[in-house]
Curated annotation (Swiss-Prot):
Subcellular location as annotated: Host nucleus; Host cytoplasm
Catalytically driven reaction(s): RNA(n) + a ribonucleoside 5'-triphosphate = RNA(n+1) + diphosphate
Methyltransferase keyword on record: no
Name of the protein in question: RNA-directed RNA polymerase catalytic subunit
Family: Belongs to the influenza viruses polymerase PB1 family.
Job of this protein: RNA-dependent RNA polymerase which is responsible for replication and transcription of virus RNA segments. The transcription of viral mRNAs occurs by a unique mechanism called cap-snatching. 5' methylated caps of cellular mRNAs are cleaved after 10-13 nucleotides by PA. In turn, these short capped RNAs are used as primers by PB1 for transcription of viral mRNAs. During virus replication, PB1 initiates RNA synthesis and copy vRNA into complementary RNA (cRNA) which in turn serves as a template for the production of more vRNAs.
Length: 757
């Protein structure tokens, strides 16, 4: 049947059709190969935007550095990083004047956080540049390796477990003349396989000690590793993102804590809130501008776009901001916050894996690592790559490029938002001292600007003034990509506003479907996504009902669990039919056991097991939820789990769903192929780490688990806990005298062993 697509929209208001224009169905593009080229682009562009700055050489590392601050006044239309310090400081002063006490209060809040944060905060986050192995690692492993190296080099402040003490170690490590590190390496040897009598390559992993001098260590500590940003929609070119190492992470965390605390108090900031809370905040600003623009005033809104936000920001500017924000605060606090921007002013960008060469004729492939780019003959490269390498060569040291200006993506989102809001704040009439005035919203590099004035000339003048003010602090509004409309229609961080926010439903499309965790979680997540979209995204009842039917169908095909009375033949149908025939109450079978679907849009909030519990046969209940059944996973299943939901763009969202432990909550095993690679040593470290944590949690069930205070180690805490528990159990008669004395003996032995060590 042919459908005329225009018929679909006859009853739909135009603004609701925005969803259909988004490129958000289907798989997003992923990058393959190395990010070296993208990283070189970033480095070269960043220097180009600041090219009229002053060149200096870092005395410790010998890296050439470009400083554009207080450089020439920026030119029109060309993006540039020449921020003027006095302008930034003045913007900060006016921001404080409009919000009395804001900086003071945020500093006090942050000081409290600084004193309480444990070093395990750094284990959050995914990939981290591990400077000891010179490549990316999971955050927890990278932290463990760093602490291990610090310890073997006589730095022990971090034993107390406070992040601030770990940062003291980082500072001390930078003064050391040399550091000794442990690296992993691979040995290959050819041996004859006893079974097949063929020759095979056997790999063994070794650890070796290596000394690193001060200069090399500093370069590693200041290095940001780079990767290609994956899954970016609507772009032809990929771009590079940075993963900083452990030395930088802690300092950045404290700066962002301070900035977050400031953003929470600013009505123009789109961070750190999200979702409906963010929409409410935005709607308030719009309402304020609409009500104040009485009949005499015009009100226009710019949907703004900034050119290369990160590459024109400058860490030196952030240092100036922090110095101002923390003026009157204790010296130690000011020092600890100023280290992150100082490290970023001296940062090095690691160029990634390098280039891969193929000779079609000789069927050869070879990799040119980034370290070789400084010396290799350029005749092997094509024109554009040659230009990139020539440009970057003066900046190269040991396969990393000196990158003083610019910020790299996603490092100081909150602090850069504070800078943006400080310019929006200058739009009040008392500062513009004329008939036009402005306000707006800022969320990292995205902004919306609302300008009010008596006539069109006033609007134009207001926009021009805003544009020029931004230029003075290194923000470059793009005249090509920003557009202006009567207030009431604009877009900000993918929220479309048209006299109220329009649900951009297409953004949520990728999160519909089967997640692939396990049968239990997938069912729960699937219905929760539909429920949430009915609440938040205008998903109507009829569409929701259809989405539900499609989901159930998808789910049955994924897990091959078609109804027991179906004609569809799959690998599981024999077992499921047998179960169907011997079940008295067929409605009680879970969908994943070939049962019928009892969900409709009224009961999406109830986990399937609970929905069908009363309908189940008794023996089926017993199998499904029996804690003695070896297939019921008891990996600390809470009553609420978190799923990571990927919207079409924007950060991954965490979504809560109800989790009921059944035979269907299985956990897939780790892929074994990792065991044959150089990652194996790391995997063993990780498992050791995991075992220790699990053991610790056995002693301290989550209800009674408070973070250890003071300097007792995990072992001491567990031993003292074991003694207390044993005494209570013995006195209440739960354990016999022999068991009690055996526990005491074990505790004593552990303490003895620790002393001898």
């Amino acid at each position: 049947m042919d459908v005329n697509p225009t018929l679909l929209f006859l009853k739909v208001p135009a603004q609701n059709a925005i969803s259909t224009t988004f490129p958000y169905t289907g798989d997003p593009p992923y990058s393959h190969g190395t990010g070296t080229g993208y990283t070189m682009d970033t480095v070269n562009r960043t220097h180009q935007y600041s090219e009229k700055g002053k060149w200096t050489t870092n005395t410790e590392t010998g890296a050439p550095q470009l400083n554009p601050i207080d450089g020439p006044l920026p030119e029109d239309n060309e993006p540039s990083g020449y921020a003027q310090t006095d302008c930034v400081l003045e913007a900060m002063a006016f921001l404080e004047e409009s919000h009395p006490g804001i900086f003071e209060n945020s500093c006090l809040e942050t000081m409290e956080v600084v004193q309480q944060t444990r070093v395990d905060k750094l284990t959050q986050g995914r990939q981290t540049y591990d400077w000891t192995l010179n490549r990316n690692q999971p955050a927890a492993t990278a932290l463990a390796n760093t602490i291990e190296v610090f310890r073997s080099n006589g730095l022990t402040a971090n034993e107390s477990g406070r992040l601030i003490d770990f940062l003291k170690d980082v500072m001390e490590s930078m003064d050391k003349e040399e550091m000794e590190i442990t690296t992993h390496f691979q040995r290959k040897r050819r041996v004859r396989d006893n079974m097949t009598k063929k020759m095979v390559t056997q790999r063994t992993i070794g650890k070796k000690k290596q000394r690193v001098n001060k200069r090399s260590y500093l370069i590693r500590a200041l290095t940001l590793n780079t990767m290609t940003k994956d899954a970016e929609r609507g772009k032809l070119k990929r771009r590079a993102i940075a993963t900083p190492g452990m030395q930088i992470r802690g300092f950045v965390y404290f700066v962002e804590t301070l900035a977050r605390s400031i953003c929470e108090k600013l009505e123009q900031s789109g961070l750190p809130v999200g979702g409906n809370e963010k929409k409410a905040k935005l709607a308030n600003v719009v309402r304020k501008m609409m009500t104040n623009s009485q009949d005499t005033e015009l009100s226009f809104t710019i949907t703004g776009d900034n050119t290369k936000w990160n590459e024109n920001q400058n860490p030196r500017m952030f240092l100036a901001m922090i110095t101002y924000i923390t003026k009157n605060q204790p010296e130690w606090f000011r020092n600890i916050l100023s280290i992150a921007p100082i490290m970023f002013s001296n940062k090095m960008a690691r160029l990634g894996k390098g280039y891969m060469f193929e000779s079609k004729r000789m069927k050869l492939r070879t990799q040119i690592p980034a370290e070789m780019l400084a010396s290799i003959d350029l005749k092997y490269f094509n024109e554009s790559t040659r230009k990139k390498i020539e440009k970057i060569r003066p900046l190269l040291i040991d396969g990393t490029a000196s990158l003083s200006p610019g910020m790299m993506m996603g490092m100081f989102n909150m602090l850069s938002t504070v800078l943006g809001v400080s310019i929006l704040n200058l739009g009040q009439k008392k500062y513009t001292k004329t008939t036009y005035w402005w306000d707006g919203l800022q969320s990292s590099d995205d902004f919306a600007l609302i300008v009010n004035a008596p006539n069109h000339e006033g609007i134009q003048a207001g926009v021009d003034r805003f544009y020029r003010t931004c230029k003075l602090v290194g923000i470059n509004m793009s005249k090509k990509k920003s557009y202006i409309n009567r207030t009431g229609t604009f877009e900000f961080t993918s929220f479309f506003y048209r006299y109220g926010f329009v649900a951009n439903f297409s953004m949520e499309l990728p999160s519909f479907g089967v997640s692939g965790i396990n049968e239990s979680a997938d069912m729960s997540i699937g219905v929760t996504v539909i429920k949430n979209n009915m609440i938040n995204n205008d998903l109507g009842p009829a569409t929701a009902q259809m989405a539900l039917q499609l989901f159930i169908k998808d789910y049955r095909y994924t897990y091959r669990c078609h109804r027991g009375d179906t004609q569809i033949q799959t690998r599981r149908s024999f077992e499921l039919k047998k179960l169907w025939e011997q079940t008295r109450s067929k409605a009680g079978l879970l969908v994943s056991d070939g049962g019928p679907n009892l969900y409709n849009i009224r009961n999406l909030h109830i986990p399937e097991v609970c929905l069908k519990w009363e309908l189940m046969d008794e023996d089926y209940q017993g199998r499904l939820c029996n804690p003695l059944n070896p297939f019921v996973s008891h990996k600390e299943i809470e009553s609420v789990n978190n799923a990571v939901i990927m919207p079409a763009h924007g950060p991954a969202k965490s979504m809560e769903y109800d989790a009921v432990a059944t035979t269907h909550s299985w956990i897939p095993k780790r892929n074994r192929s990792i065991l044959n690679t150089s990652q194996r040593g790391i995997l063993e470290d990780e498992q050791m780490y995991q075992k220790c944590c699990n053991l610790f949690e056995k002693f301290f069930p989550s209800s009674s688990y408070r973070r250890p205070v003071g300097i007792s180690s995990m072992v001491e805490a567990m031993v003292s806990r074991a003694r207390i528990d044993a005494r209570i159990d013995f006195e209440s008669g739960r354990i016999k005298k022999e068991e009690f004395s055996e526990i005491m003996k074990i505790c004593f032995t552990i303490e003895e062993l620790r002393r001898q060590k």
